Amino acid sequence: MIKKLKGRQRIQLIACNNINYVYKTEFHLGESAWKWNPTLKSFIYKEISQIHIIRIPAFLLIIGKVLNLIREVMRFRGKVVIVANNLANGKVIERLVKTMRQPALLTKYYAGGLTRKTENLRQYLEADKGLTNLKVRSKYIKQLIGLQDLERKPAYIVILDAIQGKFLINESAILGIPTIGCGDTTINFPKLNYPLIGNFKSREKRGSVLLLIKHAMFEGMRQEATIFAEYYNKYTRMYKSFLK
């Protein structure tokens, strides 16, 4: 909905369905709002509430740039996906999540099906009472971790069995998602950002995985803040130039 204002032929954006959709789906995701970047969230809300421009072409340009900004920021949010390939590794996940107590680890993907094309995928979401098993058809990793036209990529993917997870590692490399892989000396080192050799049943290995997960979370948050500042400064200047 667009409303014309008096003076200098300004146009005020009263409501924009696209931005509201992005705001509701990408910033809440069915979880509490405080779990995500409050500065970014407040900025988007401010832009939704009142946007002033002069010409319709400029309006379309600014809205397109804002949507691109949101899409880029979503890619670098500090969320970590952990992939386990068997029940023993799944128990390692539970211990790590319990130790972390971080909202960024609420979502996990589990089972060997995630690392192979032909098997069904089983997505485990942490509920109030343990884990809920949801069986879904194989959509490969791009569809699994993304939304149509608005991919929300995690900061890192932790693969607790990199030997069986070659397909997942390749897909992550194509999508530009950093990976942490655990396995023996036969794992594909070039495509892994952080390879860990040996099993992770020992306290030392679990500590290493935990440390890398924390690093991944903070790295994702750092990238999020950096790219947001870059886009914000660039398009704020462009936006103000249309008001002169």
Curated annotation (Swiss-Prot):
Its main location: mitochondrion. CDD domains: RPS2. One of its GO terms (biological process) is translation. Pfam families: Ribosomal_S2 (PF00318). It is found in: Mitochondrion. InterPro entries: Ribosomal_uS2, Ribosomal_uS2_bac/mit/plastid, Ribosomal_uS2_flav_dom_sf. Keywords: Mitochondrion, Ribonucleoprotein, Ribosomal protein. GO terms for cellular component: mitochondrial small ribosomal subunit. The keyword RNA-binding does not apply. Gene3D superfamilies: Glucose-6-phosphate isomerase like protein, domain 1. Transmembrane segments: none annotated. GO terms for molecular function: structural constituent of ribosome. Belongs to the universal ribosomal protein uS2 family. This is Small ribosomal subunit protein uS2m. The lineage of its organism: Eukaryota, Amoebozoa, Evosea, Eumycetozoa, Dictyostelia. The gene is mrps2.
